[in-house]
Each structure stands twice: as structure tokens, then as C-alpha cells.
A protein has these predicted regions:
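S-adenosyl-L-methionine
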Residues: 3-182, 194-232, 362, 377, 381, ...
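SAM/dcSAM-binding transferase cores
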Residues: 10-27, 43, 300-392
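Nucleotide donor/acceptor-binding cores
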Residues: 160-161, 189, 265
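Conserved SAM-binding motif I beta-strand of class I
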Residues: 187-195
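Short SAM/SAH-binding signature in class I
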Residues: 231-240
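A short, conserved alpha-helix within the catalytic core of class I
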Residues: 244-255
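C-terminal substrate-binding/active-site "lid" region of AdoMet-derived donor-dependent transferases
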Residues: 253-307
Length: 392
């Protein structure tokens, strides 16, 4: 490859952003370059965590940088000489990690006394149901479960308060019991769980019984209003909804229905990394519900496996106000999950043989999970790397 002028290299940022339809534009590509410069050698997941950009987007940008000679072919990856020169031209050479060394920027550190809780939750997770990616599920790690309980403690909800979990595939209800058991203190006066999955509810029931933990379980499709017996009953709520604006509106509406009347009720809301325009829609839904943001922690939630996130998500601490009200009083009938809204296909590359396949609505595989389950049709292997969106 011939040497390029600094100006032509900088112009590559715009080309890469356009190639992957990056909502963050040149600044998003610049952030990814800076992260590779600071963290090298770095896996895609670490770059996603540092930049806050979705994992598939970071992977697609990485492939575009490789094709232009800015990023090496090895994994974990580092910038090439040309990439380092571009980083210098952009002024992003500083190698400094300002995150807290103890909590890693998560604000909440798990004390050593709760290491036992983490280990117990890992064992409980191993016996539990798998994530259902069609429902936008990605199971959070045992450490994240404990941090969520600690977040409820920091918010003043626990000990002594009541908590409604709108969807609990992450088993936070169980985590409340395990943490309380390890500390020797009953944490919640009441824990309510509303979930559509009987598998999840059965697992919670079995585990809670062994812990002598009382959990109020309700099998319920959240497209329908919250059951009357749960309305207006809880001090606080927690939800990790489908990763769409519609999912935000519906699940937070059901949380609001379950809270006791009054301002300053706590809601802990988890969500995955999305582009700026999608995040704007999500935050507009939150404001539309009459909720205000009391705090936000990036990368607070870490997820296992290969679900819709396969990485990290933020925790947003919300408070109710005098104007807080559900936006979905009756039955909800619109799109809810990512698969119901996705109209563009994305190309995926088999790591084993480099064959490429479109995935998405109208393709042979509706999701990368379907492709992964089937295996590469060319070599039978995998795994698969996300590439750019297929042009319409």
C-alpha cells in the first residue's frame, strides 16, 4: 500500500463511518481508533466497553479499518504503523486510564465479604434456563447481579423496602436472597417478579425455596396491564427491557403501574449500547413517562454468551415525579423486540473459512443465533464476525 498523506488518512474516518452507516460519524471512528491505541492489543469487546458503541458496530468498523491497512489482522488487535501515524495526526496518542482502579469506573465495588455470593450465584446460573435471544435476552454475570443488589442498597431501597422486578431472566430476585443470606440480614420486605417465562419463574421458585426466600411470582405477558394485585404496591422497581424504544416504554410503564404513589420512587433501568439516534428515542420515552435521571453508570451491566448485547450495558437510576404515569394503560399491540423492528440485513463472516452470509429479515437466517446454531454451511464451523449492513 502506498504511503498516504495525513489529510487522506483523516478522510478515511468519514469513509469508514459511511461504509458501516455509523450514526456517530467520524467521531465514532475516531473513538474506536483511540481505544485501540490505548488498549492494544485489544479484543472487540474491550473496545466496545471503552467507547460505549454496540459490539457489532465496533466489529464492523474494525473490519473496515483492517481493509484500509489501519488495523492489524491478528486478534486481539492493534493499530498498524499507518494506524499509529493516523492516531498521532489525530492527537489521540495519550495512554492514560482515568477509571477508578478499584471499581473500574462502575462506581460500585463488590466487597470481599460478598465473594461467596458471587460464587453461589454462578452455580445457580449454571442450573438455570438459557437466554432466549428472540426476547432480547442476554444473561448478566453473577458480579452484575450482586452489583444490582448493591445499587438498590445504595439507593436506600434495601434493606427494608419492597422491589418489583419487571422481567427477571437475570435472577436479581435470587441475588437479593443470596446477598442477604451471606450478610445475615433479610434485605427486602417484599420481592415481586413478573415474567412471561415459566422456565424462569420455576427456576426462581426452586431456588427461593432452598434459600427460604419469599418471592411473589406472577406469570404474565407484559403486553397486558399489570395485574391489579401488584399495582401500587412497591417502593422501587427494576427492569432490563427489550432493547428498543417500544420495549422501554412498555416495561417502564408496567414498573410505574407497580409503584406506590408519590414522587422520588426509585427505578433502576438497564439497557444496552445503541446508536445515538436510537438512544435519543429511548431517553425521550423516559421523559414522556414523567421520570427524571438521578444517575447513570456506563458498562455497569456485563452480559454472558452471545445474545443481543454479548457485552455491556448501562444502569440508569430514575426517579418518579408528580407527573409520572404509565404510557400504556391498556393492551400493547405494536412491535417490541429488536427482531420485530430490524429491517436491514447484516453480513456475517465465518472465522474458520471467511465465507460471508447475510443475516436478518428475509435472509436464510433471521438472527446470528440461528446461523450459529446451524453452523457455517460452507465449512460447518464458526464463530461468526459481524460486518457491514447490506445495502438496501
Amino acid at each position: 500500500m502506498n504511503a498516504a498523506s495525513p489529510n487522506s488518512d483523516i478522510a478515511l474516518l468519514a469513509e469508514v463511518a459511511e461504509a458501516v452507516r455509523l450514526q456517530e460519524g467520524e467521531m465514532g471512528v475516531r473513538a474506536i481508533l483511540q481505544a485501540f491505541r490505548q488498549l492494544a492489543p485489544a479484543p472487540t469487546r474491550a473496545i466496545s466497553r471503552r467507547t460505549g458503541l454496540p459490539l457489532p458496530i465496533v466489529a464492523a468498523v474494525g473490519n473496515e479499518l483492517r481493509s484500509r491497512g489501519l488495523l492489524g489482522q491478528e486478534r486481539p488487535s492493534r493499530l498498524t504503523e499507518r494506524g499509529l501515524a493516523l492516531a498521532a495526526e489525530l492527537g489521540v496518542e495519550l495512554n492514560l486510564d482515568p477509571d477508578c482502579y478499584r471499581c473500574g469506573g462502575l462506581e460500585i465495588a463488590i466487597p470481599s465479604v460478598l465473594n461467596e455470593a458471587v460464587e453461589r450465584l454462578r452455580r445457580i446460573m449454571a442450573d438455570g434456563p438459557n437466554a432466549d435471544v428472540s426476547l432480547d435476552q442476554s444473561l448478566c454475570t453473577a458480579e452484575t447481579k450482586v452489583r444490582r443488589v448493591l445499587a438498590l442498597i445504595r439507593a436506600g431501597v434495601l434493606p427494608g423496602g419492597s422491589v418489583l422486578l419487571v422481567g427477571d431472566d437475570d435472577l436479581v430476585s435470587v441475588a437479593i436472597g443470596v446477598v442477604g443470606d451471606v450478610l445475615g440480614v433479610p434485605l427486602a420486605s417484599r420481592v415481586g417478579v413478573v415474567d412471561i417465562s415459566t422456565d424462569i419463574l420455576d427456576h426462581i421458585a426452586d431456588t427461593a425455596s432452598a434459600l427460604d426466600l419469599r418471592v411473589d411470582l406472577e406469570q404474565h405477558d407484559l403486553r397486558e396491564p399489570l395485574p391489579q394485585r401488584l399495582r401500587g404496591q412497591f417502593d422501587a422497581g427494576m427492569t432490563d427491557p427489550p432493547y428498543t424504544a417500544e420495549g422501554t416504554r412498555l416495561f417502564l410503564s408496567r414498573v410505574v403501574e407497580g409503584l406506590k404513589p408519590g414522587a422520588a420512587r426509585n427505578i433502576l433501568f438497564s439497557f444496552g449500547a445503541k446508536g445515538t439516534e436510537e438512544m435519543l428515542e429511548v431517553q425521550q420515552e423516559i421523559l414522556g413517562l414523567g421520570l427524571v435521571t438521578h444517575g447513570m453508570i456506563r458498562n455497569f451491566n456485563s452480559y454472558e454468551g452471545s445474545g443481543i448485547l454479548a457485552g455491556t450495558g448501562f444502569l440508569q437510576h430514575l426517579l418518579t415525579t408528580a407527573s409520572t404515569a404509565s404510557l400504556v394503560e391498556g393492551t400493547y399491540e405494536g412491535p417490541l423486540y429488536t427482531r420485530e423492528k430490524r429491517s436491514r440485513q447484516r453480513e456475517y463472516e465465518c472465522v474458520s473459512c471467511s465465507a460471508r452470509f447475510p443475516v436478518g429479515a428475509g435472509a436464510r437466517w433471521n438472527s446470528v443465533a440461528d446461523l450459529r446454531d446451524a453452523g457455517c454451511p460452507q465449512c460447518g464451523g464458526g464463530p461468526f464476525r459481524p460486518l457491514q449492513l447490506v445495502a438496501e
